[in-house]
Amino acid sequence: MTLQITETYERLRASHISRWGIVQTTYPQNIAEHMWRVWLLCRDWGAAAGMPQHTVRQACEFALVHDLAEIRTGDAPTPHKTPELKELLAGIEAQIVPEVAELEATMAPEARELWKFCDTAEAVLFLKVNGLGAHAYDVQHLLMEQMKRRLMDSVLDVEVQDELMFQFERTIKKT
């Protein structure tokens, strides 16, 4: 691990970078908690869907680092990320933590889809439990629709897609 990523992890430990700047919540989720919860979902749901271990491992590895750049940039709300802003942020993030950009560039498409599904699912689950008001409800449902659409358009086998949706729906009913 390079000095740059070690320093980034130290900042993560020492600071409280909150997510959900545009959505009122009962609890100020931080980036470390979010990445850990995405890791749990990748590990559990990937295995339940019968995905190869190396694919699940790759998604899990990325889940633990995917938002490290937000320690310096802050959390840019997804609804405000235009394609131009996404491209700009990707360039900035690659300069801040190049290891994360390198890891993402080498991810298998199936691992990327598992991670992205779990990343969005974690946000939906967090808002279901902690979101306050109509805006939080609207954002939760917008994210859920985006997640479902992306999954249907993904490279994942239909059986894997079905199992991931089953795991998500079972989890959201329990919350």
UniProtKB/Swiss-Prot annotation:
Keywords: Cobalt, Hydrolase, Metal-binding, Nucleotide-binding. Co(2+) 1 binds at residues 34, 66-67, 119. Its cofactor is Co(2+); Zn(2+). Co(2+) 2 binds at residues 70, 75. It catalyses: dATP + H2O = 2'-deoxyadenosine + triphosphate + H(+); dADP + H2O = 2'-deoxyadenosine + diphosphate; dAMP + H2O = 2'-deoxyadenosine + phosphate. Uses a typical 2 metal-ion mechanism to dephosphorylate dATP. Zn(2+) in the first binding site is replaced by Co(2+) in excess of the latter. GO terms for molecular function: hydrolase activity; metal ion binding; nucleotide binding. DATP binds at residue 19. Belongs to the Caudovirales dATP triphosphohydrolase family. Homohexamer. Catalyzes the hydrolysis of dATP, dADP and dAMP into dA. This step is essential for Z-genome synthesis (containing aminoadenine instead of adenine). Specifically removes dATP and its precursor dADP from the nucleotide pool of the host, preventing the incorporation of A into the phage genome and favoring the integration of the Z-base into the viral genome. This is dATP triphosphohydrolase. The gene is datZ.
